């Protein structure tokens, strides 16, 4: 709702024109308007999360929903009335296959015509078969460690650790190992965005600097070789969703790198994440759009 507080007046001079007046300039407003408009006559007085409208959505795109088998598949059929012309593909079935190994098997068996696979799988597929075309997609997608500043006692007490620990993560090594080189070192959530600035601290890999900053902040190594401060060991767990093997690999690599420098870190693959209590997790996001609306709002 806060996105639209600048609106002072809305008029419709004709059936195909809407004029919106704002109280002040807002460069992000054009992106705010990309959010779909909900039909009041279908949703008034109903719970948005459970309304039938959400199970039978109607849009303005080239395809229309035919069926939805929850947790299994979504079937779309071409919409002949699409304003840009009839689609060439008559029907599209999106199969929901969370496990990457299962996706690869279904791709090989012919149950799937197309699938998003992991770099290690792409390498084996390219080696074993000439029946597949592999496409590389340039995206704004990134991975990062998200620290829990509210629910984790360690990071709630010492939030400055997030920046300090960044110097102990060798992102080049992670790209080579977990992604087989299919990626680049990230330093910002809007790195692939037109609003990005490269003139910021990039936290380049420098474990010596990390340890120096820890010591300046009052952390000292105990008899076990683990940094501690005020009786608290620098000890935490990095989680990742078990069905995302790339994130699990990344969590393990981050843990190994930090453990080599006196930080007790454990990596865990979990079926479900406890967002309120966990210390840290490997997240994925992408922000090619207006940063004010998409990342920081």
Regions found by a protein language model. Give the residues of each.
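Short, well-ordered beta-strand elements
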Residues: 18-20, 61-64, 74-75, 90-96, ...
